From Swiss-Prot:
Location within or outside the cell: Cytoplasm; Secreted; Cell surface
Residues that hold Mg(2+) according to the record: 242, 285, 312
Keyword Protease: no
Species in which this protein is naturally found: Burkholderia multivorans (strain ATCC 17616 / 249)
Protein name listed in UniProt: Enolase
PROSITE patterns reported for this sequence: ENOLASE
Binding positions for (2R)-2-phosphoglycerate per the UniProt entry: 163, 337, 366-367, 388
Length: 427
């Protein structure tokens, strides 16, 4: 039995300089697991609650000492002595202890830190790499990365309304080569922007954040960078967008301030369809407001056979909401953010539900990250097929890519890179 004998919660800083929660879990054998939780900038209204102190004079109210105290007191008391290898039972214990629908009492940040740290300790105790502990002998597929090379929206202080413009390397035989492709396109884009006298400063997720005149101009420039790096757009590298449409939906209209447009759901569907026709876009995330289910239905009916339509704010990694979306034919993919739901068990359940319905699952970081690379192990362990973890800069993003390189090396000849087949539900 891998009995838990000590739990330590602490307040650390994330990649934006805001407090977040870290947890150490010590087992009877002396084995330890450590985990840190991320935090989002654009968040869905139905996400599990991230507990903040609200004390204006300390970290502008963003401290997490209350969440840390919950770890060090009642959570510690509740799980001390439990078997760390019984993840589902441990997470159930956390859920019952919290007793709310949205984890608002203990805080999803406190609960997730403990859930992850326990899993890491149990994997170490078992002598298994974390991805293998999660997935067993069937874990052998590396994820296709969606690399956010231009940041807009809530992730950058520029004129772009769409939050993320991403490249997706698909023709490469290995993850290592896909990562190299992404890095080379990133540096080619930096040179193009520099030559134009445009900003090469980066946003929260490591992508560039220049002022483009339109989304169209931004996408065209990315195509130039792909070509400059020696790759073929539409063959070697595809494009993906995260609209984060909930952020610019006001008074029943999608208000693209950067382009001076106010569009209805039908008009915004037309807008996105035009972009998908003009550019090799394989995936669009949060193309409609999280509550605009009629708009989502329009978008899915229009593009759902040829473009991956990812629900992030729409589904918030929640099986109850995902089930409703599946039944209504809304979207065809779910973004998986571990801190949206708050425990590993619930996260894995969402991935499995998506797969059973032939929805793809994209494992994702948050804009406020740490050096914790657990999501890389989840992506491989659960054979998710896709990961979204930022650009090719900032060590908080690169840590996940580097972990995937290590995993691919560890897997050796049995490692596989799915490329275009990761989008298995598209025609």
């Amino acid at each position: 039995m891998s009995a838990i004998v000590d739990i330590i919660g602490r307040e650390i800083l994330d990649s934006r300089g805001n407090p977040t929660v870290e947890c150490d879990v010590l087992l009877e054998s002396g084995t330890m697991g450590r985990a840190a939780v991320p935090s989002g900038a654009s968040t869905g209204s139905r996400e599990a609650i991230e507990l903040r102190d609200g004390e204006a004079g300390r970290y502008n109210g963003k401290g997490v000492l209350k969440a840390v105290e919950h770890i060090n007191t009642e959570i510690s008391e509740a799980i001390m002595g439990l078997d760390a290898s019984e993840q589902a039972f441990l997470d159930k214990t956390l859920l019952e202890l919290d007793g709310t629908d949205n984890k608002s009492r203990l805080g999803a940040n406190a609960m997730l830190a403990v859930s992850m740290a326990v899993a890491k300790a149990a994997a170490e105790e078992a002598g298994l790499p974390l991805y293998r502990y999660f997935g067993g002998s069937g874990a052998m597929q590396l994820p296709v990365p969606m690399m956010n090379i231009v940041n807009g929206g809530a992730h950058a202080n520029n004129s772009l309304d769409i939050q993320e413009f991403m490249i997706v390397p698909v023709s490469q035989p290995t993850f290592r080569e896909a990562l190299r492709c992404g890095a080379e396109v990133f540096h080619a884009l930096k040179k193009i922007l520099s030559d134009r006298g445009m900003s090469t400063a980066v946003g929260d997720e490591g992508g560039f954040a220049p002022n483009f005149g339109s989304n169209d101009e931004c996408l065209s420039t990315i195509l130039q960078a792909i070509e400059k790096a020696g790759y073929r757009a539409g063959e070697d590298v595809l494009l993906a967008l995260d609209c984060a449409a909930s952020e610019f939906y006001h008074d029943g209209k999608y208000q693209l301030a950067g382009e001076g447009l106010q569009l209805s759901s039908a008009e915004f569907t037309d807008y996105l369809s035009t972009l998908a026709d003009k550019f090799p876009i394989v995936s669009i995330e949060d193309g409609m407001h999280e509550s605009d289910w009629d708009g989502w239905k329009l978008l899915t009916d229009r593009l759902g056979k040829k473009v991956q339509l990812v629900g992030d704010d729409l589904f918030v990694t929640n099986t109850r909401i995902l089930k409703e979306g599946i039944e209504k034919g809304i979207a065809n993919s779910i973004l998986i953010k571990i801190n949206q739901i708050g425990t590993l068990t619930e996260t894995f359940a969402a991935i499995e539900m998506a797969k059973r319905a032939s929805y793809t699952a994209v494992i994702s970081h948050r804009s406020g990250e740490t050096e914790d690379s657990t999501i890389a192990d989840i992506a491989v362990g659960l054979n998710a097929g896709q990961i979204k973890t930022g650009s090719l800069s900032r060590s908080d993003r690169i840590s996940k890519y580097n972990q995937l390189l290590r995993i691919e090396e560890d897997l050796g000849d049995i490692a596989s890179y799915p490329g275009k087949s990761a989008f298995y539900n598209l025609r």
